[in-house]
Every structure is written in C-alpha cells, then in structure tokens.
Amino acid sequence: MALKEELMKFFEGEEDKRIVVLGIGSSIRSDDAVGLEIIRYLKNKGIKNILLIAADTNPESFTGPIRRFKPTHVLMVDATHMGLEPGTAELISIERIRGQWFSTHHLPLSELAAFIKETMNAKVALLGIQPKSISIGSDLTLELKKAVERVSKIIYESIIAK
C-alpha cells in the first residue's frame, strides 16, 4: 500500500479528528532533523484542528500539551534506521514499534507511543524516514531534503482529506 493510502487509513475514524504531528530529531545531526523540518513545512500550511510539535530529541517532554489537546491521532515523525534507501518513508504501527528499535534516539519511542495510546486513547503511529547521515552537521542531505518536501505533502494531503 502506498504511503498516502496508509496515512489516510491511519487517520480514519473519529469525525471530529484532533491530530498531533510530533516531529522528533536533532537539528545538529544532519538527516536526524527530518522530523523537525516536516513540522516547519506543515506549520506554513495553517491546518485547523492539528497540533504541530517540533520536539527535538525529547518528545516525552511534550506529553502535557499533547494531553491537553485531547488528540484522536498522534503521528510521530522521526529519522528511522530501517535498512532502506535514504529518504524512504514508512508508516510503522505501534505494534511494530514495540517489537524493534527504530529510532536514532535513546528514548524508546515504543514507550512513548504506548503511554499516549493508553493514557489518551489516541491512535499512534511512527512515520519513519530512512536517514543517509546522522553525523554532526546542520544540513540535511539532498535525499532527505527531497523526502521532506515529498512526505510533507503526503501528510498534508492525508490530513485535509479526512
């Protein structure tokens, strides 16, 4: 199934959707900033009933604002080691997050996803994007710059199609 169809299926459900997009990453580690860049792109779109959070490397610090927003859906976006071509994006279910270590960060996203699902009764998924480099450096690689534009458009179209 194509990414757009997977996201549209993920966002199905509640009529009054309240969506959180949680961008995770480090702005000083090249492609690790992909989640933050996607949040920046989406903020310029002015989407209603959506909370966009650039969580840097500590997404657990934003559970308070997420809880107050009362989300129906939480989409975490992060650079994710999946052994794929750089820039490849894949929607990863909470069940798959629990079974493997995907993130480039120390906090297991499985714990954060489980906490959000259990305490806020929201659907949770990880949109992982394969990095090329997570070395110290401020710029995304060309592959990830292209992925930011492509994936951001897919997220935007999937949300407004709800």
Model-predicted segments: where are they?
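N-terminal catalytic or cofactor-binding beta/alpha core of small enzyme domains
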Residues: 1-131, 138-160
